[in-house]
Amino acid sequence: MACILHIETSTSLCSVAVSDDSHVIYHDEERTSEKGSAAERLGTMVDEAMSFTDSHAIPFDAVAVSCGPGSYTGLRIGVSMAKGLCYGRDLKLIAVPTLELLCVPVLLSEKLSISTLTSHLSPLASHLPDDALLCPMLDARRMEVYAGVYDRALKTVRPVQADVDDADTYREWLDQRPVFFFGPGAQKCMEAIGHPNARYIEGMEPLARWMQPLAERRLLSGQTEDVAYFEPFYLKDYVAKLPKKLL
């Protein structure tokens, strides 16, 4: 099986991982606060991951990168790093959609916690209801979130888009079945959605160590990217901010 380096930089939690023979054998995560520090730390983290594989004489076959949506700067840094590694080492490039990545720990774990607006935290059942839908969310600033809707097989029910967090956005699904909301953007939507079929899973963030099943599936099916022309899925155009201090 393949050895894959995984890179995730869509949020302020920068992470890398290495999988070999369908098992994660190395992972590292670090919260960053400044744009410059994110680029610097990612380079160091990748170097450390490669030192680990070199010490075990494990050659890489591919690099997988979380491709968005998410932080414009973070995605640009992560994708640039992945493309550089693939070009320099003649590796295959795999793009993993960030919101699908967020679903992986929810589908695999039996020890999550869920909440509603009317109950305290309680253990998640050993598996999700058969008709459950998953709605991973990333903060898109202001009153918006990046969100998609998926079934338990990760089939897209509604494509990714930037949503305004109001009560009507997900009503067509909530009126019919339970919908599980999670990810860094879910917290600010809890009160706005306010539906009895809404379930909230806390503590979910996109991490490189969860990329393995999605990346490996894409690699085995030949879903790799053109290293020269691949770009992140930003979804929204970048908006430059004015500096706080004017010269």
How should each PLM-predicted stretch be described?
Residues 1-67:
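N-terminal beta-alpha supersecondary unit
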Residues 10-13, 87, 143, 228-229:
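Short, basic and Ser/Thr-rich N-terminal targeting/leader segments
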Residues 39-46, 82, 208, 212:
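A general structural signal for well-ordered alpha-helical segments in protein cores
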Residues 201-247:
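Acyltransferase
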